[in-house]
Regions:
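Adenine-nucleotide phosphate-binding core of ATP-dependent small-molecule kinases
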Residues: 58-104, 144
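Short helix-loop-beta junction
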Residues: 123-131
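Glycine-rich phosphate-binding loops at beta-strand->alpha-helix junctions
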Residues: 97-124, 139-143
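Gly/Ser/Thr-rich loops at beta-strand to alpha-helix junctions
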Residues: 9-13, 29, 111-115
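Glycine-rich phosphate-binding/hydrolytic loop that grips phosphoryl groups
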Residues: 135-166
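Residue-level signature of catalytic and energy-coupling elements of molecular machines
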Residues: 39, 107, 151
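Gly/Thr-rich phosphate-binding beta-strand-loop-beta motif of the actin/hexokinase/Hsp70
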Residues: 1-25, 39
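Glycine-rich phosphate-binding loop plus the immediately following alpha-helix
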Residues: 19-66
Length: 166
C-alpha cells in the first residue's frame, strides 16, 4: 500500500495501490524534458545547454540570488509539481478513496535528482491538501532504476503464477 511517483524525462507516472492492487493510476505527458524546453525558451538558451546545467548544478533548495537559468528551472519545476499534485487531487476526489492508515509516498525518476526536489514536492503536496493522509514522503533508493526493478518483480510474480497453474 502506497503512493508512487515516477518523474521521468517524458512523463510523470503515478500509482496509488492498496494491498498491491492499483486504486488510481495516471500519467502526465510532462517531465524533465518539458521543464528543460520551457526554461530554454524563457532564457534564450538551447535545450541541451539548459539540460546540461540542470543535471550538473541545479539546487532547488536555493531560493535567493538566482541566475536567470536557476529562476526559470525553479519556476518550471514548481509548475510541473503543482500540475501533477493538482491532477492527483482531482483523481482522488473522483475515486473517493478511503484508506485507514497514512500512505507512504515514494518518488523516483531522473527529474527528481536535483538537490531540493523532495522538499519542493512535499511543499506541493501540502499546498493541495489531498483528501488522503500521507505518511513518509521519500526518494526511492535508486531513482533511475526503481521503475525497471518494479517491472522485473512484477514479471517474475506473473511468471510464478503461470507456473503454479500448470
Amino acid at each position: 500500500t502506497g503512493l508512487a511517483f515516477s518523474f521521468g524525462g517524458g512523463m510523470v507516472n503515478v500509482c496509488l495501490a492498496n494491498l498491491s492492487i492499483p486504486v488510481t493510476t495516471f500519467s502526465i505527458a510532462r517531465g524533465g524534458d518539458w521543464i528543460d524546453k520551457q526554461a530554454a525558451r524563457a532564457v534564450g538558451e538551447s535545450v541541451s545547454a539548459v539540460t546540461g546545467w540542470k543535471e550538473s548544478y541545479l539546487d532547488l533548495d536555493k531560493r535567493e540570488n538566482l541566475s536567470r537559468m536557476e529562476q526559470a528551472l525553479s519556476i518550471y519545476y514548481d509548475i510541473l509539481l503543482d500540475y501533477v499534485v493538482g491532477h492527483l487531487k482531482t483523481e482522488l476526489e473522483k475515486s473517493a478513496v478511503h484508506l485507514e492508515n497514512p500512505l507512504t509516498v515514494v518518488v523516483s525518476g531522473g527529474t527528481a535528482k536535483p538537490t531540493g526536489f523532495l522538499k519542493r514536492f512535499q511543499e506541493a503536496l501540502q499546498r493541495f491538501q489531498l483528501p488522503i493522509e500521507l505518511g513518509e514522503v521519500r526518494l526511492a533508493p535508486q531513482l533511475l532504476h526503481s521503475v525497471t526493478k518494479g517491472a522485473l518483480i512484477a514479471a517474475i510474480v506473473d511468471e510464478s503464477k503461470k507456473q503454479q497453474k500448470e
